[in-house]
């Protein structure tokens, strides 16, 4: 029963990068510290995300660790639209870290800046192993977990009277109707 995978404990994050002067970001749920010395993290990113391609070329990224105060609109903004179709920095509040990349502060409790030192091809995703170059605590608010998101933040889709073809993403709840 693959539902057992939902019992793994992990957070939700805004992953940002930049390439050729264009900033972008997406929601990811797989960021973890893998070593303390050197301080390294790993992040798995879907190859279909523009942010993936930016990180693959630029070799740098930021992770904003979302807190329990985060709103569904944040997940919708960063995770339910493509950076190829929209400017994700338009009409949002953000800051830049020492590496020049964007991080969000309002709904995050910390950010981490990192430089890629290794890449592992996982088929649909790439696992980026990266050395932490900067990190900062923003607030003491608890980090949002995937379980907390589903119980307290995620909006339940309204029932439709007309059936449409599509799918619902099991990770973020995004509904694609084609």
Language-model features: locations:
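Basic, polyanion-binding surface patches
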Residues: 1-164
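Short cysteine-rich clusters marking metal-coordination/redox-active sites
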Residues: 169-172
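Cys/His-rich metal-chelating microdomains
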Residues: 175-178
């Amino acid at each position: 029963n693959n539902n057992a995978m939902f019992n793994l404990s992990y957070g939700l994050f805004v992953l940002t990068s930049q390439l050729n002067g264009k900033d972008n970001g997406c929601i990811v749920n797989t960021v973890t510290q893998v070593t303390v010395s050197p301080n390294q993290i790993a992040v798995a990113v879907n190859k279909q995300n523009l942010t993936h391609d930016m990180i693959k070329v630029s070799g740098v990224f930021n992770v904003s660790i979302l807190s329990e105060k985060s709103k569904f609109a944040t997940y919708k903004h960063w995770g339910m639209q493509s950076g190829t179709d929209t400017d994700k920095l338009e009409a949002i509040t953000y800051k830049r870290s020492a590496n020049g990349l964007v991080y969000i502060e309002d709904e995050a409790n910390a950010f981490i800046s990192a430089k890629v030192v290794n890449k592992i091809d996982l088929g649909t995703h790439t696992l980026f192993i990266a050395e932490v170059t900067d990190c900062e605590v923003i607030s003491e608010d608890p980090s949002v977990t995937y379980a907390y998101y589903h119980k307290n933040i995620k909006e339940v889709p309204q029932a439709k009277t007309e059936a449409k073809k599509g799918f619902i993403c099991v990770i973020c709840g995004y509904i694609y109707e084609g």
